[in-house]
Amino acid sequence: MVLRSLASPAALTDPKRCASVVGVAAFAVRREHAPDALGGPPGLPAPRGFRAAFAAAYAVAYLAGGERRMLRLIRRYGPIMTMPILSLGDVAIVSDSALAKEVFTAPTDVLLGGEGVGPAAAIYGSGSMFVQEEPEHLRRRKLLTPPLHGAALDRYVPIIENSTRAAMHTWPVDRPFAMLTVARSLMLDVIVKVIFGVDDPEEVRRLGRPFERLLNLGVSEQLTVRYALRRLGALRVWPARARANTEIDDVVMALIAQRRADPRLGERHDVLSLLVSARGESGEQLSDSEIRDDLITLVLAGHETTATTLAWAFDLLLHHPDALRRVRAEAVGGGEAFTTAVINETLRVRPPAPLTARVAAQPLTIGGYRVEAGTRIVVHIIAINRSAEVYEHPHEFRPERFLGTRPQTYAWVPFGGGVKRCLGANFSMRELITVLHVLLREGEFTAVDDEPERIVRRSIMLVPRRGTRVRFRPAR
């Protein structure tokens, strides 16, 4: 009876039913899973003997209800709560900025960031910097940092501008289309040019195609299902992923060899060339396989999240005309302050990823509660970004809140935090500002739909339900 109730999508959305389900389950184990004698966090019940069934029911409920349901649970149980979830095991969900700071600043041998990557590791690959633990992660990160920060970003601006203009020439005029769809193509074009240093359109398409195939697998429900069934070999035997990786190897390894043999390597400024030239503290180079793995990581991570953010920014701007006018004024007259505030606010209310995670390698204390080894600790980005304790009118789109002030480190976490914070955050911000300015300076856009888009989950991403439908015409 309890299990059937939990499996129902209504069970964790209706407060009365949620309370009754929890109460019945609590009776079965003598009490609801509240802070126990050892100081464990509160959370959903999972009676001994039925734990796997409850974990499956909770997983189904989450997949059916997504972040809306999770936010209701967070409001019920507080800033840290626990629940078992099929394929993830014991999960502790952190939804408070102070506790997020504890997670992000914990020793790297206590909380493992690579283990926390979860389903995405199946797409990035076991050699990706994302899934490495310390000290290997830090070694690779230091070598990858220079091409994505500081003066290097300025060199990419003309590439981004030219790609944006070229893309606009292919868009339908005065007919509805999904901004998310064209943003994906645009961002892939940009990232391929920036990373590989190519500009011939046919070569860009040839390099981009296998990455696009791999990325499509990463944003499909197939990834979610295969990750849940990974112990049955669903990830080991995945022909579509194997084909995409083989195609990537064919194009990338050949490019690496060409670049190593290039006598003018030192004059090039693309990311591939900088990685081939990079030397560690002891003079060591990255191997071909390490470069390949990191290039895959950069292409995939720098593509979908940025495209999704651009689509969300358009959805919000087109339904907030005053903000749209201010961004357009900066695009035409110069300045970036309000545009930056718009992107920060977009990432606050519409982060492309709902969460980031670590795995406890040993017992630790978070928020005064004991968390056992093996627990997956999930920092819930949406809950933290929309905290009423930090933000006035937290659910409203108000870019002005970020004018003249930087987002708080642990109360604004769309890029994660700690040593695993997104390496490409600065590049993403520069890319979004540049693309927005070109589009709004050289194009006119209107919303197709009267109401803002609903958030829906696509695998590990949160995207606009209809892809942000717009009408476009070149500016007069």
UniProtKB/Swiss-Prot annotation:
GO terms for molecular function: heme binding; iron ion binding; monooxygenase activity; oxidoreductase activity; oxidoreductase activity, acting on paired donors, with incorporation or reduction of molecular oxygen. The keyword Oxidoreductase applies. Heme binds at C422. One of its GO terms (cellular component) is plasma membrane. It holds the Pfam family p450. It comes from the Bacteria. Its cofactor is heme. Its EC number is 1.14.-.-. Keywords: Heme, Iron, Metal-binding, Monooxygenase, Oxidoreductase. Belongs to the cytochrome P450 family. This is Putative cytochrome P450 137. It comes from Mycobacterium tuberculosis (strain ATCC 25618 / H37Rv). The lineage of its organism: Bacteria, Bacillati, Actinomycetota, Actinomycetes, Mycobacteriales. The gene is cyp137.
